[in-house]
């Protein structure tokens, strides 16, 4: 149950990261965000037993976690406006589908054959979002992607990295919660980007600081609860619950970053959610 709360917080993450990028800059905003979050998750979860986790988990599991942070942040930071931010965010929301796929292929999760139908529906929903057409206008979809290919490409890799992290954690973390370690590494990475001036940085402002604090608490809680859930709970149920994250994300985006979402966009999101019920029935 604890792990199932995290998708609610994930729904806020797209708008929060985008706002931080606009108010303080990707490097500066997320450096402060992860520094505060590091203190929070340390008090909440402490330090894991580093000797208990095998080397392969440090390389693969933590590597994927850091990869997620980098690709997710820059995919949103490079988006041109609120609407494109949500398009990029929807690509990132392929991670629930990929989490189930990886669990079936590599972690011994059992599923009925029609789980594939649910996964295809989720992918179809993403295509509808990107093309703006129920019949999938590949030309329009390609035009969207071509306008900012790096942003869309990074979003896809963020989805792949997070799905892999979830399954590596389930298989190899030995019951340890590495959230504090992950946030420590993220803090180092984003502070390096800020201090080395590798990304645009904006003057300090009240809105940016408030969002950094709020985002830190939300992201820290989401990471920790998700990691606890994939270790102790049923990863397939958590993945299904996470299918509702796109709906929450769209609602928050409309309120926080002024994203203008079309009817076709909402239909595409609804199709993604429909895929969740089919996957639920199959697992």
Map each language-model feature to its residues.
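Hydrophobic transmembrane alpha-helices of multi-pass small-molecule transport proteins
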Residues: 41, 60, 111-134, 243, ...
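Glycine-/small-residue-enriched transmembrane alpha-helix faces in small-molecule transporters
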Residues: 1-28, 137-171, 217
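Specific transmembrane alpha-helical segments of multi-pass solute transporters/efflux pumps
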Residues: 9-16, 48-86, 128, 216-233
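Hydrophobic/small/kink-forming positions within alpha-helical transmembrane segments
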Residues: 11, 15, 42, 62-66, ...
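Specific alpha-helical transmembrane segments that line the substrate/conduction pathway
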Residues: 28-38, 76-107, 235-255
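Hydrophobic alpha-helical transmembrane segments of multi-pass integral membrane proteins
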Residues: 1-2, 27-44, 55-59, 118-124, ...
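Hydrophobic/aromatic residues within transmembrane alpha-helices
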Residues: 20, 29, 75, 105-111, ...
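Membrane-interface helix termini and inter-helical loops of multi-pass transporters
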Residues: 15-23, 77-81, 130-147, 194-212, ...
